[in-house]
């Protein structure tokens, strides 16, 4: 095993001698040694020896050492199924443990960084690379027109920017940001204005669902806690450390042995409410406690540099969720499921508040003998006595000299009553008026009532010269989470609404032809007419199909949610695959029928949010927004929002990438943001872009800091909304320090991108060049994916897409509508499949051809220009950096093995030609990325990431060969079963499928993403 893991090679991940680096090295050594001991004890030394032999397939750099032929491949092919499964499980377990150690290291590193920020502040660049938005100091450029642009910059400027930009990307903290703003002479009034409107919303989704079982997640958390305890021991007295360390090592070994004996695969397909509980875990265990720390860190950093400025409101960072509300392609998200989700969320947050108030009762033991209270607190106690006499009888004597404890006893009882009432509402069939009602004052109808009581206590403490951090933290949490924890977005695909209206209008006989046959202009006219009348269109009793009835009932359920939980819980309806303005008007018509849209005024408590996903829809998005803003009721409609005159627009990274490739997708999204912002400003409206980013690069994933800074100037303005995919929640929010770091990084990037900008965004000729590159890249990508008749068969045979669809990891089907076409396949399994085979094709294919064709026009000048882009333009640098990172994870040798071994004999020649085409594009892309970046090897600019990728690649190589072997056996078994041939395998299909799925789990853990 040690030859696979190479535990003696201590410089593989990081060369720094920091405490965090030493901790990483020590922890890697420890867990690898423990894992070897566990495997030997549980499965014998033979398994350890087998893993060492398999490790010889990969080089130290993490790629296949040589063509996979000869004795080693014979070993894999000759493995008994049980041996192959044990090997796959061992690699899977190794990756998951390494992930824990890396997260632990990241947390340790973040602590070190926070402690050293005072030194780091003096390390900021002396030369600014960007300026104040709209006011001053944009980075000067030498290009004034297209001719100048193509002439290229000087080598000196290239070098200086190459040195400077990585320094800026190293940081992402408040303590670094505010001194930098001061150094750049950003006017404090601009900073204050931005802080006043700072609005960051992170939306958790269930898809792609985390591939790891919740049971395994629990074990991972226990391992992480043991590593934390080891850290504490290292700071203890030496005579205590050895004995305790041995005890912890024994506990670690015991935990991993239990883990080894636990099934890794999901035993059943999760239901939607299972996904809800999984997501809520991160709020309960981490996020709830981290939010006050985030606010305190911002406030402290701000006041150290700008003591006169006021920090933003507590609600500057909020959360949303699609889990339980996203219906797009998921038939299991019913109205009652969404209702139960809202109750689950409220129950969680109320339980946390109850715990906090109980702690405050113990803490605030102030006596009237030693402190004064204000009359308003005494008045409130008299009112409490009338409303909750039982509490007065119980505590009046005990707390007669302790007014804060008495007040909090009343608060606690109201919270408990509110929680009990919420539990009674959890069954959807029980409406609010049917639930047990309490008298006013005995429970809280909304979070603002609870907050008012906390503020009363805080004000009394401050007036008497006291403060209570735990109370301040609770107030912060209430302002951020309220009683609903996170806002619930509803999402549905656009054709569902059109088909429902088609059935409704046909039943009523009010249109001359089916609704779906109307032109866009005819649809718009009819929808506007219906929106202007109070006459209901839909009868109270629903005589329609189940699908249409469910659409109608969803809107009625939203109305009930708003009545019970408040409009803040659920006020956005996202329309996926939006094409025209009629897609939005259809949703507003259903909202009107449910009482959410007022036809007399145009006011609405539900906003229709278009989601533009394909390249064609992104190009058409400005026209759709123009039509929406031109509607006669639009000003009243937007003016009724919680943020007046703000329209939200969602841009999809996944389907646009699947549709046109990585470069074209990113450029179309970039352009769409610029155009939509200009349109909103021309109508006098505000715009919030909702970024539908996935976890993988092929779906818009990657470092959030660089991605936010790469957005066009003037499109953020302190306001952003981003999805946090189910698969990345563990890597970002499983540990408090990681969660705090992630939230601080996002907030820092939003402030920085709003106040500082690169003037390159305004150079039109540079956009023309990007348009050329995007067009060429798209043509190359689509030629392979959509214009090669054998490609869909190639994809189905050489990737594990068939087997991925059988993983029990998601409540949602892998395809829209169940059709087996490339267009119906969701972007998540599309990316997942290419990741498993090490092609990672969606994140880079077509980029090399686009760069090559551009460089061929004027080689020297255009190369200089592309390097200039890379050094100066955050957008272009982000694109190239993501491509570089993805290329480093590609392994064409293992990919070739998938093609050779999994292709049907009649397809092998054609599929090998496709492989050669992909391999040629890979080599071309790698060569040109290295030329532009100036690196000798991929990721030379980030040695720590380079070593991490190499470490993972090395162990993924043998796991990939195991996967191919198991897939081949499984498919041969399926083929023999289908043809009626005599089965030659000694194993059943279930055992073979289990082995294949275990390798999928392992590679996903190694690559750290599914889709």
From Swiss-Prot:
Entries under PROSITE patterns matching the protein: PEPCASE_1 (PS00781), PEPCASE_2 (PS00393)
GO biological-process terms attached to the record: carbon fixation; oxaloacetate metabolic process; tricarboxylic acid cycle
EC id: 4.1.1.31
Pfam family, one: PEPcase
Reaction catalysed by this enzyme: oxaloacetate + phosphate = phosphoenolpyruvate + hydrogencarbonate
UniProt key word Magnesium: yes
Superkingdom field: Bacteria
One cellular-component annotation, GO: cytosol
Active site: 207, 658
TM spans (from-to): none
Enzyme class: lyase
Single GO MF descriptor: magnesium ion binding
Magnesium is among the record's keywords: yes
Cofactor(s) the protein requires to work: Mg(2+)
Keywords: Carbon dioxide fixation, Lyase, Magnesium
Its biological purpose: Forms oxaloacetate, a four-carbon dicarboxylic acid source for the tricarboxylic acid cycle.
Family of the protein in this entry: Belongs to the PEPCase type 1 family.
Name this protein carries in UniProt: Phosphoenolpyruvate carboxylase
Organism of origin: Thermosynechococcus vestitus (strain NIES-2133 / IAM M-273 / BP-1)
């Amino acid at each position: 095993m040690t030859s696979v893991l190479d535990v003696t090679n201590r410089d593989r991940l990081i060369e720094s001698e920091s405490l965090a680096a030493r901790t990483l090295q020590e922890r890697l050594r420890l867990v690898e040694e423990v894992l070897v001991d566990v495997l030997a004890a549980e499965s014998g030394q033979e398994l350890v020896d087998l893993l060492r032999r398999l490790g010889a397939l990969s080089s130290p750099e993490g790629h296949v050492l040589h063509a996979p032929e000869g004795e080693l491949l014979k070993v894999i092919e000759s493995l008994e199924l049980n041996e192959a499964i044990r090997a796959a499980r061992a690699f899977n377990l190794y990756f998951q443990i390494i992930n824990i150690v890396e997260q632990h290291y990241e947390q340790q590193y973040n602590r070190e960084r926070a402690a050293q920020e005072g030194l780091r502040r003096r390390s900021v660049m002396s030369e600014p690379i960007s300026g104040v938005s709209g006011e001053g100091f944009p980075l000067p450029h030498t290009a004034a027109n297209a001719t100048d642009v193509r002439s290229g910059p000087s080598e000196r400027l290239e070098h200086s920017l190459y040195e400077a930009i990585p320094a800026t990307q190293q940081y992402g903290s408040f303590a670094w940001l505010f001194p930098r703003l001061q150094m750049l002479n950003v006017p404090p009034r601009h900073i204050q204005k931005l802080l006043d409107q700072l609005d960051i919303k992170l939306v958790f989704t269930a898809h792609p669902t985390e591939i790891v079982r919740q049971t395994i997640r629990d074990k991972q958390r226990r391992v992480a806690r043991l590593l934390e305890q080891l850290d504490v021991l290292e700071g203890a007295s030496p005579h205590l450390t050895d004995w305790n360390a041995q005890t912890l090592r024994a506990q670690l070994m015991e935990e991993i042995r239990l883990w080894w004996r636990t099934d890794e695969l999901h035993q059943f397909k999760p239901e939607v409410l299972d996904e809800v509980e999984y997501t809520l875990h991160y709020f309960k265990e981490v996020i709830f406690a981290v939010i006050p720390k985030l606010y305190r860190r911002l406030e402290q950093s701000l006041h150290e540099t700008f003591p006169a400025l006021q920090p933003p409101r507590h609600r500057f960072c909020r959360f949303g969720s699609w889990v339980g509300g996203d219906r797009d392609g998921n038939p299991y998200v019913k109205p009652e499921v969404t209702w139960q989700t809202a109750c689950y969320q409220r129950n969680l947050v109320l339980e946390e508040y109850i715990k906090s108030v109980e702690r405050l009762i113990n803490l605030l033991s102030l006596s009237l003998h030693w402190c004064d209270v204000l009359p308003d607190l005494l008045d409130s106690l008299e009112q409490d006595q009338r409303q909750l006499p039982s509490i007065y009888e119980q505590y009046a004597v005990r707390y007669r000299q302790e007014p804060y404890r008495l007040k909090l006893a009343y608060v606690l009882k109201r919270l408990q009553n509110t929680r009990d009432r919420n539990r009674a509402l959890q069954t959807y069939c029980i409406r609010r008026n049917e639930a047990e009602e309490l008298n006013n004052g005995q429970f809280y109808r909304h979070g603002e009532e609870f907050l008012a009581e906390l503020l009363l206590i805080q004000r009394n403490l401050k007036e008497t010269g006291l403060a209570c951090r735990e109370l301040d933290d609770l107030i912060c949490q209430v302002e951020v989470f309220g009683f609903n924890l996170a806002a619930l977005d509803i999402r549905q695909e656009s054709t569902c609404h059109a088909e429902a209206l088609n059935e409704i209008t046909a039943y009523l006989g009010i249109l001359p032809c089916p609704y779906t046959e109307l032109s866009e202009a005819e649809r718009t006219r009819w929808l506007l007419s219906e929106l202007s009348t109070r006459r209901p269109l839909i009868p109270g009793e629903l005589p329609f199909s189940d699908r249409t009835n469910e659409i109608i009932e969803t809107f009625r359920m939203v109305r009930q949610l708003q009545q019970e939980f408040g409009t803040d819980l659920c006020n956005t309806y996202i329309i996926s695959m939006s094409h025209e303005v009629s897609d939005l008007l259809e949703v507003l018509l259903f909202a009107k029928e449910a009482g959410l849209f007022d036809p007399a005024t145009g006011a609405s408590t539900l906003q229709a949010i278009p989601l533009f996903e394909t390249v064609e829809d992104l190009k058409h998005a400005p026209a759709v927004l123009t039509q929406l803003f031109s509607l006669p009721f639009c000003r009243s409609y937007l003016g009724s929002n919680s943020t007046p005159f703000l329209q939200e627009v969602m841009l999809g990274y996944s389907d646009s990438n699947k549709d046109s490739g990585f470069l074209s997708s990113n450029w179309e999204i970039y352009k769409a943001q610029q155009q939509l912002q200009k349109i909103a400003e021309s109508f006098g409206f505000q715009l919030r872009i909702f970024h539908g980013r996935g976890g993988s690069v092929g779906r818009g994933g990657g470092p959030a800091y660089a991605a936010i800074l790469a957005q066009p100037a003037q499109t953020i303005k302190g306001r952003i909304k981003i999805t946090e995919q189910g698969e990345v929640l563990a890597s970002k929010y499983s540990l408090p320090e990681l969660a705090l770091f992630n939230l601080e990084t996002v907030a820092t990037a939003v402030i920085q991108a709003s106040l500082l900008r690169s003037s390159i965004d305004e150079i039109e000729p540079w956009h023309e060049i990007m348009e050329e590159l995007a067009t060429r890249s798209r043509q190359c990508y689509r030629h392979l994916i959509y214009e090669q008749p054998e490609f869909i068969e190639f994809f189905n045979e050489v990737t594990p897409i068939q087997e991925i669809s059988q993983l029990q990891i998601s409540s949602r089907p892998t395809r829209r509508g169940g059709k087996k076409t490339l267009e119906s396949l969701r972007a998540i399994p599309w990316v997942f499949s290419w990741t498993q085979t090490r092609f990672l094709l969606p994140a880079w294919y077509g980029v090399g051809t686009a760069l090559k064709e551009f460089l061929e026009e004027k080689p020297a000048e255009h190369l200089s220009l592309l390097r200039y882009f890379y050094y100066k333009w955050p957008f272009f640098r982000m694109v190239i950096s993501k491509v570089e990172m993805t290329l480093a994870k590609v392994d064409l040798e293992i990919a070739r093995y998938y093609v050779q071994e999994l292709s049907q004999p009649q397809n092998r020649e054609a599929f090998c030609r496709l492989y050669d085409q992909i391999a040629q594009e890979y080599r071309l892309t790698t060569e040109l990325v290295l030329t532009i970046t100036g690196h000798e090897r991929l990721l030379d600019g980030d040695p720590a990431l380079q070593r991490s990728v190499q470490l993972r690649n090395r162990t993924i190589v043998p796991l990939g060969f195991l996967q191919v072997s198991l897939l081949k056996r499984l498919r041969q078994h399926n083929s023999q079963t289908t043809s009626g041939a005599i089965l030659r395998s000694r194993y059943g299909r279930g055992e073979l499928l289990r082995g294949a799925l275990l390798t999928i789990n392992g590679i996903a853990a190694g690559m750290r993403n599914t889709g």
